[in-house]
C-alpha cells in the first residue's frame, strides 16, 4: 500500500496537505487527514483520478461536506480530494455547464441572474453539483436528474467520457455513479427561461421553509434517513410518530424541529451521532416494524459501508 501511495503521489506531482475535516463537513465533526489534495483545476483532477486508477488507490471525493459522518477517532489513511476549486460555471442560452465543485448557492444565483429556472429546489442547501449528481439530490418534489443533460466523468478504466443521461437512468437517491469507481468532472444542466421575480420568489420560499424547519440552527448532515415510498409517509414523520424528537446521545440530538435531522447540539462525537442513528433505527423498528435506511455516508469507519 505504501509503495502504491508513493507511486501515486509521484505521478500526480501535487504535495498532500494536512487538514482537519472538522472545517470541511457540515456536521463539524472529523479528524486529521495528512493526504488531503486540492486540485486547482479540472486537468489536475483528471491526473489525480487516473493515477489513482492505475495504482489501485481508493480516493474519497469531498465537496460541500454534507450527507457524511467522518470518524473522529482515527486518522484518515486514504487520499481525500477536495473539489472546492473546481467551481467554474458557464451559461449557454438555457443551459448551465458547471464543474463538480460548484456550490448550490453560486449555481442558483447565476441561474437567477440569467433568468433560468430549475434549480430553485436546491437553494439553501450546502452541497456541490458533483455530490448532487452522485446521490441524485432531491427536495420539494424535484430531483437533479430532471434537469441533467450531459455529464463528463472518468470511468474505471481511466477514460474521460461525456455522455447524455435521462431521468430514467436515475432512481430515488440513486445514480449510475454509485458503487462504481467513476469520477464526475462536470455537468450540463438543461433549464428553462423564466421571469426573474418568479424564480427569486421560489428560491426565497424554499429557503424560508428550511429556516422554519431549523435547518441552520445546529450542524447536521442534512436528512439522516432516506424516505421509503412503501412506508407511505416520510421518515421524519415516522420518527415523530414514535415520539423520538429530542432523543439524545452525548452531544447528538434528534432535532425538535425536524425528525429526520440528527444534529450536533453540543460538541458531539462521531460515535454520539452514530449511536443515536442506531438507537432511532432500533426504536422505530421496535414500534412500527419499519427499518429505516441511512442517507448519511460513513467515512473512515472500519468495516462500515460508505
Curated annotation (Swiss-Prot):
- Active-site residue list: 223 (proton donor), 295
Q: Which GO terms describe its cellular component?
A: cytosol
Q: Does the record's keyword annotation contain Cell wall biogenesis/degradation?
A: yes
| Enzyme nomenclature, EC number | 1.3.1.98
Which reactions fall under this protein's catalytic activity? UDP-N-acetyl-alpha-D-muramate + NADP(+) = UDP-N-acetyl-3-O-(1-carboxyvinyl)-alpha-D-glucosamine + NADPH + H(+)
FAD-binding PCMH-type domain sequence ranges: 28-194
- The main place the protein resides is cytoplasm
GO annotation (BP), single: cell division
Specify the protein name: UDP-N-acetylenolpyruvoylglucosamine reductase
The species this protein belongs to is Borrelia garinii subsp. bavariensis (strain ATCC BAA-2496 / DSM 23469 / PBi)
